[in-house]
UniProtKB/Swiss-Prot annotation:
Chain residue ranges for the region called Disordered: 77-117
Protein localization: Nucleus
Kelch repeat start-end pairs: 159-210, 215-259, 261-307, 308-356, 365-411
Record-linked Gene3D superfamilies: Kelch-type beta propeller
Protein name: F-box/kelch-repeat protein SKIP11
Gene expressing this chain: SKIP11
Domain of life: Eukaryota
Alphabetical GO biological process terms: protein ubiquitination
Subunit and partners: Part of a SCF (ASK-cullin-F-box) protein ligase complex. Interacts with SKP1A/ASK1 and SPK1B/ASK2.
């Protein structure tokens, strides 16, 4: 997708090492819109594709082409070869005609309606087409003119996608301090995110992460007592300071549903285990305090299932023992209900030899409103039987899903897939593997290796962004 374009011409991510390419073979994926001053300056763009038509896969399926006019320094959308020839031209048109065409493009192809996007089919049909495009196409689409750029950069296109049931899930994870990568499991492409800004204390501290809406939140400590949040925005491809919680904490359980997320439990800067819960709205960037849970807990996990939020397991009580119960929060009634034995059982070896604090929080994920768990000790996958309220073993984890007491192993829902990210260390520094299973047939897990990546360490943090 616009492979030859210079990274300086727009905010971009770096696409690297899919299973079909060597890790040293890099190209550019342009998913982020340029600022107006860059697009409307006196000079040409960094790339001047003279008289060339570029088609991304999803645009080609819809019959549209992205056309670059070297004279007007702008893009337009074409619905066929005749329009492409007319837009590119033969170089004989006057400068006045070229300027008129540039203004025409800035108005979305309609000099009478500045909001029509694709004039031939109207705004509503234009949007109906655009929400079906891949997320990776939106950088190119945003480069067409101001109207397309506003649609993408404002986040409106993602809200419309969500409302109409079009969601792509990408996996974001960190295996190096302050460095994050994204992985598209469908196209099997890697994207490098900008390096996080932070203090030395935050860089070396334990961090927690969650993707909500078009944001990736990374939470940690900036000094020994101050909790901070850094927010990565998909819309700008940049990091910024996020809004602090009403009751800052760490070691909480969290999950997101569309543009909202719930953070439950955790402990404060003095180590007190909390029963607090808060809801975050990524579009408004606001925190709302929710009713308190029935039990204080830390090192717990959170999921959304059947439209309700669940906090699972963790450590609580006066003696800081492991909790086997969970709690359900109903967003309509705003009430918590305790559920016995919702936490997946620990293996016998873990129960005998390990304190609860040494083990990672429950590795749980929800696919199609079914709750799954990874048992890192027995290397098994379990499924929660809602009717009988018990856990059943359904099969094995991937062979190379190594971890240290569950730490360093990512077990996530990614749309209709379960994703497992982990791997053993080796003398050359180590590598991680990404395995996927779509639990649709009710049979045991059949894992598909999506890709592997060299890594000096295991997975520190992992989140899945669906938008």
């Amino acid at each position: 997708m616009l492979e030859d374009r210079s990274p300086d011409s727009c905010l971009s991510t770096r696409v690297f090492s899919s299973s079909r390419l060597s890790e040293s073979n890099w190209s550019n994926s342009y998913m982020y819109p340029e600022d107006d001053d860059k697009l409307l300056g006196n000079g040409k763009r960094a790339l001047e594709v003279v008289g060339e038509v570029r088609q991304t896969k999803s645009l080609k399926l819809m019959g549209f082409s992205i056309i670059y006019d070297s004279d007007s320094s702008d893009y337009s959308l074409s619905g066929g070869e005749e329009q492409a020839d007319a837009a590119i031209g033969d170089g004989s048109s006057s400068r006045q005609e070229q300027e008129q065409q540039s203004d025409f493009n800035d108005n979305g192809g309609d000099s009478s309606d500045s909001h029509s996007l694709i004039n031939e089919i109207g705004r509503d049909n234009s949007i109906d087409c655009l929400i079906r495009c891949s997320r990776s196409d939106y950088g190119s689409i945003a480069s067409l003119n101001r109207n397309f750029r506003s649609l993408v950069k404002s986040g409106e296109i993602y809200r419309l996608r969500r409302q109409n049931g079009f969601v792509e899930h990408w996996v974001y994870f960190s295996c190096q301090l302050l460095e994050w990568v994204a992985f598209d499991p469908v196209e099997r492409r890697w994207m490098q995110l900008p390096t996080m800004p932070s203090s030395v204390t935050f860089m070396c501290a334990d961090k927690e992460s969650l993707a909500v809406g078009t944001d990736l939140l990374v939470l940690g400590k900036d000094d020994f007592s101050s909790h901070v949040i850094y927010r990565y925005s998909l819309l700008t491809n940049s990091w910024s300071s996020g809004m602090k919680m009403n009751s800052p904490r760490c070691l909480f359980g969290s999950a997101s549903l569309g543009e909202i997320a719930i953070f439950a439990g955790g402990c404060d800067s003095q180590g007190k285990i909390l029963d607090f819960a808060e809801m975050y709205n990524s579009e408004l960037q606001t925190w709302i305090t929710l009713p308190r849970m029935n039990k204080p807990r830390k090192m717990c996990s959170g999921v959304f299932m059947d439209g309700k939020f669940y906090v699972i397991g963790g450590i609580g009580g006066a003696d800081s023992k492991g909790l086997t119960c969970g709690e359900e929060y109903d967003l309509e009634t705003k009430k918590w209900t305790q559920i016995p034995d919702l936490s997946p059982p620990r293996s016998r070896a873990d129960q005998a030899d390990m304190s609860p604090a040494a083990e990672a929080p429950p590795l749980v994920a929800v696919v199609n409103n079914q709750l799954y768990a990874a048992d890192h000790a027995d290397m098994e996958v379990r499924k929660y039987d809602k009717e009988n309220k018990k856990w059943l073993t359904v099969g094995r984890l991937p062979e190379r899903a190594g971890s240290v007491n569950g730490w360093g192993l990512a077990f996530r829902a990614c749309g209709e897939r379960l994703i497992v990210i982990g791997g053993p260390k080796c003398s050359g520094g180590g590598f991680i593997e990404l395995n996927s299973w779509i639990p649709s047939d009710g049979g045991p897990p059949q894992w598909t290796l999506l890709d592997r990546k060299h890594s000096p360490t295991f997975v520190y943090n992992c989140a899945v962004m669906g938008c």
